Amino acid sequence: MKKFFYLLSLLLVCQACKNVEVPDTSRQWEGKPRVIVMTDGEVDDRCSMVHFLLYANDMQVDAIIQSNSCFQRNGWSSDPWIEEQLAAYEKVYPNLKVHDADYPATDELRKVIYVGDETPSHVPQGISYKTILPGANVLVNPAEWEDTPGSDRIVEILLEDDPRPVYIQCWGGVNTAAKAFQKLQVQYPDEYERAIAKAVLYCIWYQDAGGSYIEKYHPGATILLSHHFSGSWDYGAMSNSDNFVSQYMQNGQHPLGKFYTQPYISEGDTPAFLNFIDNGLRACEDPTYGGWGGRFYRVDGFENVYRDVSLGALREWIEPALRDFQARLEWCLTPVYEDANHAPEIVVPEGLDIVVRSGEKVTLKAQISDKDPRDVEGAWRLRGHMWEQKGRTKAWLEENPEKRIEEYRSDWCQMPGGSYTGSIDLVFEGKDQVHFVAPEVKSPQTVHVLLEAYDMALPRMTSYARFIVTILPR
């Protein structure tokens, strides 16, 4: 079973440097990230749901809650669109299990569908994502609202004796979570602080007034507010991707892909789950690290409210994210493991978190492997024209593919996310090892170094390992 680890942000006194506090990365929670999806059912949500279901193996899906928003004030629970997608998922589930045994059975997902707040009057007239920003006036009072099955389910999940964070993805409005937090505070005062501290909301804009209410009255909850999904993943941002959609989804053969309702990539809500995929970027551990779902900074005046830094922090990952999505779409139609591509595996026996002193040599190394056979077909499509110019044939390539087709390639680079603002000089020692000399610092600083390993098959898939090096003064 895949394991996902969460960073517990604590401080301790380092034994190697008395009286110097350094981040402790030794305490970890084992298990997959717990996620709740709240969706208002509009077109982008339906496309994002197709994408999401193919990553259900990477997460523990605790609830899918149908809600409303300022764009879909009545919600869409009356339309069985989720049930229809799950029926299609059920058709491809046997093949998906071949490629990863952790894919949840369809009935497991059906059991966690709930209806949340779809009351139009709970969304104030005239509000806009352009004005409902961190610090906006509170316009709603969830104490006046009725409970819903969705809000009650959120309460149940947060009260469970499980220390893992609960990532609440707000594809639409936040009101269902706002009601849950209000009930939690009033009816479970002794459990409230422990429970609310586990809540992490990823909001695709504030699409109602619930986010502002949570900021003020439930500051123990963490909010990640994304605006830069617009211009990267949303409607119209990738209008030149129609070939991708027609070839891999709307091709008349894909049971789930046919529910992708747009003619091009149109998934404004997809960033809400991309950072919870177990790809090695560790974006789930801290919103400032960054990953496929963007990178965030803390908003001034708030302890737990963050906004995404830029469009570029999302756009730089679109290509590997879509290649990975393409591979999983192909898993749906491929009953034999060896006939599809899978991401390389990276193992770091010595651990990803290192503490050193200024001036010390830091060596980072990993073990990279790819279980898939060499992709002769893909290699010939990519480079066959060059080999043919030298008199080679495809049969020549098939004779000894391991000698002519690389198993994988890798890159190393310094990444944003660390506190050290200078640059380091990485010295490469092959595909799986680099070193550098720890720079001079006056106080403990962190440097993030990323290993990116990608295979040479089609579609190319990428895995990562993020090393976090804490540098202490001499």
Report the location of each language-model feature.
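Sec-dependent signal peptide recognition
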Residues: 2-7
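C-terminal motif of bacterial Sec signal peptides marking the signal peptidase cleavage site
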Residues: 13-16
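Charged, cofactor-coupling segments
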Residues: 463
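Short, solvent-exposed loop/turn segments at the edges of extracellular beta-sandwich modules
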Residues: 454-460
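N-terminal acidic, glycine/proline-rich low-complexity segments
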Residues: 19-427, 433-435, 441-450, 466-472
